[in-house]
Amino acid sequence: MYTFHSFGARFLRRETSNYPPYNDKFPIYDSDDSKTLIKNILKELNLDDKQFQPNIIQAHISSAKGQLLEPKAFRAQVGSNFFAQKVADVYESYDKHLKQNNALDFDDLLFMTTKLLSIESIRRRWQDRFHYILIDEYQDTNHAQYLMAKLIAGKNQNICAV
């Protein structure tokens, strides 16, 4: 039995060779690690952390990843709004820093798993392992979690939602 995040961590430790530049030794940044990185990026970009609060920036990045938006797609979606463009700047730098450090955050466990499950050969291999999927608190799932479950369930779509 897995949570979405624990499944993602296990899956990615086995499949990271299919997602360069990562390898299976990646650390997983918790909320505090992510916030520290965002604070450092705000300093690098000369952005005031009172105007661009790290918690708010972190929530926007998390939301983007939950919608499976990579930094460039996020930037394209937000348009010309000044604040949103600065969030996009931080997101791009944040993503770059994670990759440089072979690190993932909690949202990446869902984001990257869903991306890799979109590759047919990988998806088929994992679909053979799971014949039924039970999702507790289904109403709390985000887009990435929904898509992950749908991809794993495959053609049988044996998903039980509680």
Where are these regions (language model features)?
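Conserved RecA-like helicase ATPase core segment
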Residues: 143-162
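Helical "lid/switch" subdomain of P-loop NTPase nucleotide-binding domains
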Residues: 126, 137, 144-148
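A basic/glycine-biased coupling hinge at the interface between accessory DNA-binding modules
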Residues: 1-132, 156-159
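Hydrophobic residues in beta-strands of the RecA-like P-loop NTPase core, especially within AAA+ ATPase
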Residues: 134-141, 162
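Conserved protein kinase catalytic core
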Residues: 9, 142-143
